[in-house]
Amino acid sequence: MDTSQLKNMVRVGIVSSVNGPACTARVTFPDKDNMVSAELPVLQLGSYGTKGYCVPEVNTKVVCLFLPNPSGNGMNAGFIIGAYYSGDKPPAESDASVRSVRFPDGSLIQYDDGTITISAAKKIVLKAPVININ
């Protein structure tokens, strides 16, 4: 593998479009004259029995991993391996022990030292044969 292949294996870019049903996104690479990738799969927490689903929004800064290129696919054979925070979009939390998901509408799911907080901008729907609240 030559050095140009190594340089292109891990790239930082900005999500330019999203295909929700396919769980893929296209990424623009400003350092590559705004080259746009093919649709890249987004890594998830699970994809078989237990499935995770979280697709980055357009304009999210992401890290991409591209496969070595013996077949000539270039930057079309790869994955979005994650998003990251930067100065213009800081983390929503500052405590490293807190786990949370904050949504643009203000809704929140948060775990903090044994306490789970769920706040919804509209409504909360619970479906189960039995619901215990104590």
Q: Model-predicted segments: where are they?
A:
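Mixed-charge, glycine-accented linear interaction segment located at domain edges/termini
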Residues: S119-N134
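Hydrophobic packing positions characteristic
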Residues: M1-K122
